């Protein structure tokens, strides 16, 4: 029976009825309607099973109802989704789906940066026109910021710019005393040996005379041989009188000559090496440790990348 689809608050017949859908106002052009209505109540409902027009193919199914008052309107038709007719808008093709297994369900693919056939999966090609499924391994999803980043653009890990403050409190440790220790007696090393350079001139010395041993005369006017100077009472070179037999002899002497000097140069012998014994008795020292600060180094810490507590899932995408 071909009946025009009921609209608004129009009621159908009581009981169970079967209608044929054939271009008569239902969601599909062809199909069958199961109409249900109680014998006494006015509430009713309809189930539409459509025809696909292709042998062996699944067709969509729809359902609607109307409450049990005479002025109640029919609800909109709602499609019944099945594995053969999943909701295209409920989870759009191309949306990443966290999947807790390495075994991928039929009709889906892991998101690992692989290419796909755009002609075989036109809906997926709308989401990824490049024909490449994004590689979601190790990546998280972030809402596109208002700064104008492109959809599907990648952002490497990083931390927000910040500073650290560090200080060491100033402390006055006052004056402290070292522990007492007796170092005993120590000897210095043997040293101090040295030399002196010598240079200069010795004093003039060596001037002398010689007594004449040649001929001599008995008077002051005698002439001495061998080139000696004459002797007279005024001569400075008269030697003391030497007595002879019956006469006095006067002997002469040479002039004073032979005075000379010597130049000196060289190095005096090395001398002066010595050591000392030093007694270092038991003693202490006072050390003043005034108010001061210290430089602080803050060492690097952390992991190779920024992470939060997480559980690893595979991302899969529906192929359609």
From Swiss-Prot:
<dbReference type="InterPro" id="IPR011083">
    <property type="entry name" value="Phage_tail_collar_dom"/>
</dbReference>
<feature type="region of interest" description="Disordered">
    <location>
        <begin position="241"/>
        <end position="270"/>
    </location>
</feature>
<dbReference type="InterPro" id="IPR051934">
    <property type="entry name" value="Phage_Tail_Fiber_Structural"/>
</dbReference>
<dbReference type="InterPro" id="IPR037053">
    <property type="entry name" value="Phage_tail_collar_dom_sf"/>
</dbReference>
<feature type="compositionally biased region" description="Polar residues">
    <location>
        <begin position="172"/>
        <end position="206"/>
    </location>
</feature>
<dbReference type="InterPro" id="IPR005003">
    <property type="entry name" value="Phage_lambda_Stf-r1"/>
</dbReference>
<feature type="region of interest" description="Disordered">
    <location>
        <begin position="147"/>
        <end position="213"/>
    </location>
</feature>
<feature type="compositionally biased region" description="Polar residues">
    <location>
        <begin position="241"/>
        <end position="258"/>
    </location>
</feature>
<dbReference type="GO" id="GO:0005198">
    <property type="term" value="F:structural molecule activity"/>
</dbReference>
<dbReference type="Pfam" id="PF03335">
    <property type="entry name" value="Phage_fiber"/>
</dbReference>
<dbReference type="Pfam" id="PF07484">
    <property type="entry name" value="Collar"/>
</dbReference>
<protein>
    <recommendedName>
        <fullName>Prophage side tail fiber protein homolog StfQ</fullName>
    </recommendedName>
</protein>
<feature type="compositionally biased region" description="Low complexity">
    <location>
        <begin position="261"/>
        <end position="270"/>
    </location>
</feature>
<comment type="similarity">
    <text>Belongs to the tail fiber family.</text>
</comment>
<keyword id="KW-0677">Repeat</keyword>
